[in-house]
């Protein structure tokens, strides 16, 4: 084609590209508010789902195999006569030991727990239900306190309690303490071991301390301006718990670990061991021995494998013997193991126990050492004993149930009572300080007359001196004096009381320890006087070394039996004080001047109504001796002696005798009865 090249066949001419029009702002759709709100929610949901997947893939301890929800009653809080802070119960959260205070009994919770290797609490609620009113019982305040280390001994005070998780309880009102699983988590990914013998520190777990502060008073017993102590129940404590268990491993012996409270005042002696000087606890309390005696006989040397925890009221009396370890008794918590061999093996009524401050020390046998000399007897009003370590988890040596024939009844085993030496006697329930005994009951006096009690013995003595200070008692008849020295006599261990005057026929009525037990157990105190009674004020120098008598203490004015003068000032008289807190019987004597010489014979004192003249007749020191024919009358001289007819011959004889023989015996007895009747009519 002329004038230019021809275009390729089939080619399309280029056309300009048309630009797409963007939608205008009016045409663009705005997202709704609902869509905007859903976007962050979906993002958060995806984030949570991712976290859940990560947590599922992570291993947090063993898997939960079983759970149990139940309610357990763990005990009661009772009123107290002491004025300090006292621990009455320490309850472990270990399900084997969370039980009512009834010794080695099983509970549904302990049975379930003994079947597994590990436990952890999912939820815990502690309820205190009041058992007394708030209008008539006053003076005390209760505490529920959480202790993360249940096997730790510490000297607690109200300030240290309030620094921990606690609930303060006013009398007569219900309270609740709720705990979460996080607060009670164990050391093994939140789990605790069940068997306390494997690793007690990893098994015992946290504990709740049930405490009471200050003395409890009963306003209904108010008389003459003074109130009486209340020692009844204040609260019942129960725990509503949910437990998780893991790793099935049944151990039947763990079902019956002991957890029991003992009341009534248990006396123990703290002293250095004669073998190595370590501190040991000695007791002859039958209740304590029954709990702490090993179940399996055979061990003769060393120390028992079973470890016991003792939680009780705070005791200050033994601090001098314990030395730097005095906080154990002040805190009211320590651990013991029975000592075999030596004097403990020779004496079946008294046992010795090694004292430890912690379970780790008990497991490795690391005892404590206090002062090298000295012995101190202390009385724990309330103590709670727990079996911490039982070496045999398969058996607790309890008698197995039987399905065969009923066993033959066994006669009761005789119980050996401690009668000698007298210093070992600790008290007998129901016996007042002064009494007449008719063979079956004890009758206290109804007045406060003097010349009714004699006190003798070989007391421990010391003379203390100091700056001029007030000493004595002031009431309507007696007045205080200024003193620079005091003679102090301790009759606790070796004092003996005799009745005199109208009580002369009673003979020996008390030892020092049994008298203290009688006064502190709520018996009629006559002729003893309350130290805080209305109109009476006590003065005791600070250098005397003993507290000023007060609430719960009792006293008597006493004089030498050779002194029949009337004293109205606190000079040349004995003030015999029975201290409730320390359980000691102390006599204070003020000579008013020079030191008193050592006695050349045993002291012998008689009681005088404080500030009054001695009661007449004065004490006598012998009674009338009866002749033999007055003591034992010959049976032949008594016409009615045949009244005592024994039927033993008619019921105990040869089982092969005939019936005729029994009939003849019966006729013979009837004939003797008729003869006796005729003889009475003739008389």
UniProtKB/Swiss-Prot annotation:
Residues 398-413 have a biased composition (Pro residues). GO terms for cellular component: T=1 icosahedral viral capsid. The keyword Iron does not apply. Residues 1-45, 391-413 are annotated as: Disordered. It is found in: Virion. Self-assembles to form an icosahedral T=3 immature capsid. Residues 14-39 have a biased composition (Basic residues). Signal peptide: none annotated. It holds the Pfam family Astro_capsid_N. Residues 1-13 have a biased composition (Low complexity). This is Capsid polyprotein VP90. Keywords: Capsid protein, Host-virus interaction, Inhibition of host complement factors by virus, T=1 icosahedral capsid protein, Viral immunoevasion, Virion. Specific enzymatic cleavages by the host yield mature proteins. Belongs to the astroviridae capsid polyprotein family. GO terms for biological process: symbiont-mediated suppression of host complement activation.
């Amino acid at each position: 084609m002329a004038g230019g090249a021809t275009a390729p066949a089939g080619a399309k001419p280029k056309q300009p590209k048309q630009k797409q029009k963007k939608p205008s702002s009016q045409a663009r759709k705005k997202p709704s508010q609902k869509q905007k709100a859903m976007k962050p929610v979906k993002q958060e949901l995806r984030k949570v789902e991712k976290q859940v997947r990560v947590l599922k893939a992570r291993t947090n301890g063993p898997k939960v195999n079983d759970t149990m929800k139940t309610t357990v009653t763990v005990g009661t809080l009772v009123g107290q006569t002491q004025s300090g802070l006292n621990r009455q119960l320490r309850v472990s959260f270990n399900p084997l030991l969370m039980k009512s205070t009834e010794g080695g009994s099983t509970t549904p919770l302990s049975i379930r727990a003994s079947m597994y290797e590990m436990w952890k609490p999912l939820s815990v609620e502690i309820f205190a239900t009041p058992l007394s009113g708030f209008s008539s019982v006053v003076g005390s305040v209760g505490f529920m306190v959480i202790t993360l280390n249940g096997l730790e001994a510490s000297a607690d005070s109200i300030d240290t309690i309030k620094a921990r998780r606690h609930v303060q309880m006013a009398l007569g009102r219900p309270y609740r303490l709720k705990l979460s699983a996080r607060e009670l988590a164990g050391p093994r990914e939140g789990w605790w071991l069940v068997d306390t013998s494997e690793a007690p520190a990893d098994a015992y777990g946290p504990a709740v301390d049930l405490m009471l502060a200050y003395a409890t008073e009963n306003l209904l017993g108010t008389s003459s301006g003074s109130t009486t102590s209340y020692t009844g129940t204040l609260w019942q404590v129960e725990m509503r718990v949910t437990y998780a268990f893991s790793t099935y491993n049944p151990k039947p012996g763990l079902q019956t670990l002991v957890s029991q409270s003992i009341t009534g005042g248990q006396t123990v002696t703290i002293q250095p061991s004669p073998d190595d000087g370590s501190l040991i606890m000695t007791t002859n309390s039958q209740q304590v021995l029954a709990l702490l005696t090993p179940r399996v006989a055979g061990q003769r040397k060393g120390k028992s494998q079973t470890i016991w925890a003792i939680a009780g009221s705070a005791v200050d009396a033994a601090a001098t013997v314990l030395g730097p370890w005095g906080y154990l008794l002040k805190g009211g918590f320590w651990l013991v193991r029975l000592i075999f061999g030596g004097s403990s093996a020779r004496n079946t009524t008294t046992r010795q126990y090694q004292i430890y401050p912690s379970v780790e020390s008990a497991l490795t046998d690391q005892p404590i050492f206090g002062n090298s000399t000295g012995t101190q007897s202390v009385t724990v009003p309330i103590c709670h004993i727990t079996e911490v370590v039982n070496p045999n988890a398969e058996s607790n040596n309890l008698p197995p149930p039987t399905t065969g024939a009923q066993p033959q009844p066994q006669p009761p085993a005789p119980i050996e009572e401690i009668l000698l030496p007298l210093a070992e006697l600790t008290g007998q329930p129901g016996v007042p300080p002064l009494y007449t005994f008719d063979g079956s009951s004890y009758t206290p006096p109804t007045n406060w007359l003097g010349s009714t009690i004699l006190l003798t013995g070989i007391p421990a003595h010391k003379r203390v001196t100091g700056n001029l200070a007030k000493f004595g008692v002031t009431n309507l008849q007696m007045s205080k004096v200024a003193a620079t020295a005091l003679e102090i006599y301790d009759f606790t261990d070796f004092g003996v009381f005799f009745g005199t005057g109208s009580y002369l026929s009673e003979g020996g009525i008390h030892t020092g320890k049994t008298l203290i037990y009688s006064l502190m157990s709520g018996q009629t105190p006559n002729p003893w006087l309350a130290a805080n009674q209305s109109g009476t004020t006590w003065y005791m120098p600070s250098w005397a070394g003993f507290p000023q008598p007060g609430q719960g203490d009792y006293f008597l004015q006493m004089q030498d039996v050779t002194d029949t003068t009337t004293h109205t000032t606190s000079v040349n008289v004995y003030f015999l004080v029975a201290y409730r807190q320390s359980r000691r019987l102390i006599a204070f004597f003020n000579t008013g001047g020079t030191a008193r010489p050592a006695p050349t014979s045993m002291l012998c004192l008689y009681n005088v109504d404080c500030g009054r003249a001695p009661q007449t007749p004065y004490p006598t020191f012998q009674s009338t001796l009866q002749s033999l024919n007055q003591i034992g009358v010959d049976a032949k001289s008594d016409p009615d002696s045949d009244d005592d007819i024994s039927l033993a011959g008619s019921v105990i004889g040869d089982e092969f005798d005939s019936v005729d023989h029994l009939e003849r015996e019966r006729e013979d007895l009837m004939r003797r009865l008729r003869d006796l009747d005729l003889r009475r009519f003739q008389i």
